[in-house]
Amino acid sequence: MNKTLLALTAALSATAASAADIYVSLDAGKNKNAGTKEAPLKNLWKALENAADGDTIHLAEGIYPGKMKQNWFKIDKAVSILGGYSKDFSERKPLEHRTMCQALNDNNDKKGGGLGVFHIEFDPSQKAPDGVDMKFDGLVFDEGFANSYHETKGKPADLDTGMWLEGPAYNKTKDKFASANRYLVYSATQNRATGAISFRNSAFVNYGNIAFNLNWYKGKVTVENCVFCNNRMIGAQVLCSAAIPMDGPNKPRAGWKPDVEWEFANNTVLYTWSRLNDLADMGFGIRNNTGVKANIHDNVIGLNVLTGFDNTKGAGKTKLTNLDGNVFFLNRESDVQMTVSPSIAKVRVDGFEDLEGTDGIESIEDNEDLKDPAVFKGRLNPQFLNNFLTMKYSESTKLDEGKCNGLRSVLGLPLQGTITTKCDMFCNRYPLEDALKLFGAMAGKGAQEIK
C-alpha cells in the first residue's frame, strides 16, 4: 500500500473515530446533559451549538420550536439529523414517533434571521467543508399553524381556513402576526461546501414559500421518499452556486459538466400553489436549474397549479435532466413546461416523446398518467380535492364615475377604477394527518411506507 493511500485511510479513520452521536429529547432531556441516550440534551438548537463536523444528532419525538421559539435552526456545521425515535430511543418509527417542526403564529415576531426552518450556512470566514456527507431523515415539517389565513375570503364551507395571506396582511381576528413566509430548507447562495447531502423519509407541508430551496456547490444532493404537500411557488428545487465557464451565450466551455448531481426519487409532490392568488405564475412541483444534472424518477407529481416539472429557468445547455418513470396527474396547466425558443411549451405526459434532446433533456422515458385513481382513496382529503378541482379565479372592474374619467376618455387616457378579485381558494391549510397518509399510497411510485 503506497504512502498516499495510507495517509488517506488514516485521515478517514480519524474523521470517523472523532464523529459523535448526540441524542436529544424534548421530554426527557436537559441542556446541561452530556447528550447521550441515557442523558440526552433537551433542544435541537443546543445540539447544533455543541456539534462538530461529522456528528450525527438523533431526535426523539416532539415538536421542536427553535431557540427562544424562533422556529428556525442554523446549521453551520456538516452534521446529520435523524428523527423519529421514541422518547427513550428504544425504537425508530418516524411516522409513529414524529419529530416535528410545527411553528405557531404567536411566535412569528421571533423569527430572527433564518430564511428557512433549516437554514444551512457555513461560516464564510472559514474554509467551507469538503467531502461532507450530511443526512437528514425522518423529519416532519408543517407551517400550517404559523401561517395566517383570511377569515372569509377564499374559504369553502367545508375547509378549516380561508385563503393564505401574504404579509403584511393577516387575520386580525385569530392571529397575532403575518405569515412567516419562510423556506423550509434553505442554504445560502454563497455556500461552497462539497460532498453529499440527502433528505429522506420526511414531509414538507403547508409552506408559504418554496419548500425545498437548496444551493449546493459541488457534489450530490439526494431527495428520496419524501412528501411535498400544499406548498407555495415551488415544491423542490436545487441550485448550483458554482460558476459555469462560458464561451458565449448558452455555450458552456467545451468539456464542461454540471457540478451538482441531484437525485429526486420516489417522492410525492402535490398541491404546489402559484405565487399569487390569481393562479397566474409559478406553482411548479419541481424545477431544475443551471449547473445541475437532475435525475427525477419514480415520483408521483400531481395537482400542481401550473405544472408538474418546470424546466424554463436558465439555458438548456447549462443543465441536464433525466425525467423517467414518473406518474403525473391533474396538474392544472401542464405536466411539463420548458423553453422551446422563443416560447414556452406546455406539454402533457402523452406528448413527452417529442421533448428528448430539448432544453437539456437527456432522457424522458416511461412516464405515465395516473391509471388507477383508486390508489388515493382514503389518502387524499376529499373536501380539499373537490374544492381544488372546481376552483375559479375571477376579477371585475368598476370604473370611477365623474368628470375625471370623462376627460380621460376624451383624451384617450387610461380610465381609473377599482379591480375586485375573487379566488375560490388559495393555499388553504391542508390537514397534516392527511398529508402523512400519502406515504405508501402507490406501490413503487411516489413516497413509500417508511420502514
Residue positions per predicted region:
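N-terminal signal peptide c-region/cleavage motif recognized by signal peptidases
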Residues: 14-16
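Right-handed parallel beta-helix/beta-solenoid
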Residues: 18-46, 63, 451
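The right-handed parallel beta-helix/beta-solenoid scaffold, focusing on the short coil/turn
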Residues: 20, 55, 71, 77-79, ...
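N-terminal extracellular ligand-recognition/capping segment immediately after the signal peptide
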Residues: 45-48, 53-91
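Short glycine/acidic-rich loop motifs that flank beta-strands on beta-rich extracellular proteins
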Residues: 68-70, 91, 105-106, 111-115, ...
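Right-handed parallel beta-helix/beta-spiral solenoid domain characteristic of secreted/periplasmic
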Residues: 79-174
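Right-handed parallel beta-helix
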Residues: 83, 131-145, 162-170, 194-206, ...
